[in-house]
């Protein structure tokens, strides 16, 4: 059985090729690269496309579907629209359309939004959207890897999204624009709201630079800013303050969900959550009274492949989300 998982992230598209539960290869294409190159031609370097049994696809916010759905049943790529979601480059759209037109069997993973009825209704009342599709993939990877039925998952990268899993189902959580900051994205504070009202910037522009990048002079685009900030942690005061502030913010978000999970299992993921120097996970552990573990690797792409494989094996529900395939 050969499956492929796709993670549509802020800085690029990551693909995982898995055969019989074993990861065979992983590759990443920057979003700017995809505009000049075919994703499927790159994938073909790793596998005969006709041998693929199923692909698990993440695209954008995933707020137009509420089930894990056969790509041929999905309208408008599974989104309501592309407004208000951060900087748009177009690479993810091209990959999605390539996959759909290829006739390779594929499922599209939804985001977590108020239409997903398996979540606690209080979270759906509070927030219209909680997470983009790859966060479900990361959660499923963590669920399969560590075997916990109850845990908090915090994915820390360009943005931070923290989710709570109870009894093997996603219970709720905090989206990138609500709680903790990431490197690029974050919630809007008073100053940003005033700048929006005075039409100095749009709300989307504010969100796109409301992360700890605002502390520094280190913006290098969506693909390179995190490397600039993290690599200068020890020799640039602003970069150090940025990372220390991010750690505080994420720790606050995780702790805010801790009372809902007595087991106190916490799993950190994402490029920043797994960053070794500085060791972000150890910094967060100092602020958390719980069992803190790290999910290394390209967790979203691997999780998407795991979802595809288990659906082929007959699973009709993933973390509480129904399957229509």
UniProtKB/Swiss-Prot annotation:
InterPro entries: ATPase_NBD, Methan_mark_12. SUPFAM superfamilies: Actin-like ATPase domain. It comes from the Archaea. NCBIfam families: methan_mark_12 (TIGR03281). Belongs to the UPF0285 family. This is UPF0285 protein MmarC6_0247. It comes from Methanococcus maripaludis (strain C6 / ATCC BAA-1332).
